[in-house]
């Protein structure tokens, strides 16, 4: 079994059947009587890393680039639930980088932006699973940046927020058919970097992030059909009811988000210290419910993905380590307080 790799670099900025082992850390944050269990899945077969990118095409997830233990990376890997291992694919042709973006549209994957150790980047590359090759596409329409969010809606890609030595809130749409970028309505609320994004009900939700020394506590939802943003309930205690008493623990940056069963989950990240609290969001009620905290080592700069309605969290870093482990979240299973690893 692989273990965490000592993190030496200071940065400027599954089934076949799939192996699932109960995760291990006793009494994760917010466990108590909360529901949800974290199980160790198949380890990522590439080098341990953080600040990588991911996209999903036809029930296959792709993961690449990022910061390893001693250097930035440009390798790429794929995984599907009908195999029990990761397969290396063609290296990312844009070169080494961390803190970039990834999304998938119409059976193709897109990756770009980020930081190569010297320069903020704005190049964008398209991956074809059929040819296992990368092709340079039109540069991103906004400024070169790091720590943006990316998502896909209605056969278009979107890149929003980020940092170019200033915090940003612009929002750009990519049309793969025309290979063109068009600026759209900017994200409401503060300019930010290191936010998280998830898709529910064919709308994009941008949550939290970092701006001017603090974690943000807002949730903004984007409707691509109308090109409008709506502010949802803030992540703070604003009612006399008990459901939002602990909402302040949701605010963080460099967290991950994933969806299952028409709900979203937010976990990991940081807010002064590493954050393992896990929260479930129900868009029909605009409410968050705390679930069992992430049971692996608390981390930031991780990735998350959903395959066949199953949610996974992988990679990331702590203050001293980078990780290659993968966890599956089982939302309706009680936490096993006797898990060990």
Residue ranges: model-predicted function:
Residues 1-22:
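Sec-dependent bacterial lipoprotein signal peptides
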Residues 24-341:
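Kelch-like beta-propeller repeat domains
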């Amino acid at each position: 079994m692989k273990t965490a790799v000592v993190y030496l670099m200071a940065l400027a900025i599954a089934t076949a059947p799939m192996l699932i082992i109960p995760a291990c850390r006793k009494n994760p944050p917010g466990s108590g009587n909360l529901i949800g269990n974290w199980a160790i899945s198949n380890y990522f077969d590439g080098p341990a890393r953080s600040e990588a990118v991911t996209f999903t095409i036809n029930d296959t997830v792709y993961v690449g680039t990022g910061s390893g233990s001693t250097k930035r990376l440009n390798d790429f890997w794929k995984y599907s639930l009908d195999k029990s291992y990761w397969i290396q694919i063609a290296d990312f042709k844009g070169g080494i980088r961390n803190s970039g973006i990834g999304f998938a549209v119409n059976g193709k994957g897109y990756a770009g932006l980020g930081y190569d150790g010297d320069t903020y980047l704005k190049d964008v590359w398209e991956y074809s699973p059929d040819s296992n090759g990368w092709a340079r596409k039109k540069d991103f329409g906004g400024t070169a940046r790091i720590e943006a969010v990316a998502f896909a809606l209605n056969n278009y890609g979107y890149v929003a927020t980020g940092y170019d030595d200033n915090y940003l809130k612009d929002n750009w749409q990519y049309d793969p058919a025309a290979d063109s970028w068009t600026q759209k309505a900017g994200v409401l609320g503060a300019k930010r970097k290191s936010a998280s994004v998830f898709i529910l009900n064919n709308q994009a939700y941008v949550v939290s992030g970092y701006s001017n020394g603090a974690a943000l506590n807002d949730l903004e939802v984007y409707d691509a059909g109308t090109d409008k943003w709506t502010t949802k309930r803030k992540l703070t205690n604003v009612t006399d009811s008990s459901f939002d008493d602990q909402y302040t623990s949701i605010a963080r940056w460099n967290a991950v988000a994933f969806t299952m069963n028409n709900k979203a989950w937010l976990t990991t990240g940081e807010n002064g210290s590493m954050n393992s609290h896990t929260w479930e969001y129900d868009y029909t009620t605009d409410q968050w419910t705390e679930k069992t905290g992430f049971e692996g080592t608390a981390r930031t700069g991780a990735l998350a993905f959903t395959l066949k309605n199953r949610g996974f969290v992988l990679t990331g870093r702590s203050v001293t380590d980078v990780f290659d482990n993968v966890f599956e979240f089982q939302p309706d299973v009680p936490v096993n307080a006797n898990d060990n690893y």
